[in-house]
Amino acid sequence: MLNFWQILILLVIILIVYMYTFKFVQKFILQDAYMHINELEAPPLNFTFQRNRGVDCSLNRLPCVTDQQCRDNCVISSAANELTCQDGFCNASDALVNAQAPDLIECDPALGLVHVFSAGGDFVVSQTCVSTYRDLVDDTGTPRPYLCNDGRLNMNLNTVQFSPDACDCSSGYEKMLFRQTALARTIPVCIPNRMANLYRRVYN
């Protein structure tokens, strides 16, 4: 026969087991309901596919339809590789096999241009002209539009330092000098005679 204290302890144990069981069942039901709500809100199909560009197309045959797919999905192992889609598969070919050496571009030293070569990886070389008189001539050898416009410019910067005497204005124009600061070069400009009085406020 159980006494009062034994019955009380048994009831406490049953109550504790009931509380833990109730919390577990409640948590399971709430989690299932939350997953069901998410399934209703989510689109019917949700595919997630993410990977790094890690296919070496010179060793693996990757199916393709366009050249752009090959450029997007293939690893460029060399700067000289050219990725193209050939016969339904990406092909990494050496772009330098049939390449010809580029012709040397002309850089006129009389205009202050120097020939510059820039080399990258795998002997990819580009060339350009760089003007050493950027306030007078741009990198293409074209005089600046403000320099002796409407006049004849005679420059040989390879042998003679530039001076305003290199500009001869056409008839009907007056040569004026534009001095920006003490450290800047004096620029000759050709101003129409009818506007000379106005421009004398700015030019000498």
Curated annotation (Swiss-Prot):
Would you say which domain of life the source belongs to?
A: Viruses
Q: Which InterPro entries match?
A: PIF3
Q: What does this protein do?
A: Per os factor that plays a role in the initiation of host midgut infection. Unlike PIF1 and PIF2, PIF3 is not involved in specific binding of occluded virions (ODV) to the host midgut target cells.
What's the subunit arrangement here? Forms the PIF complex together with PIF1 and PIF2. The complex also interacts with per os infectivity factor PIF0.
**Protein name in UniProt:** Per os infectivity factor 3
Species name: Autographa californica nuclear polyhedrosis virus
Q: Which gene encodes it?
A: AC115
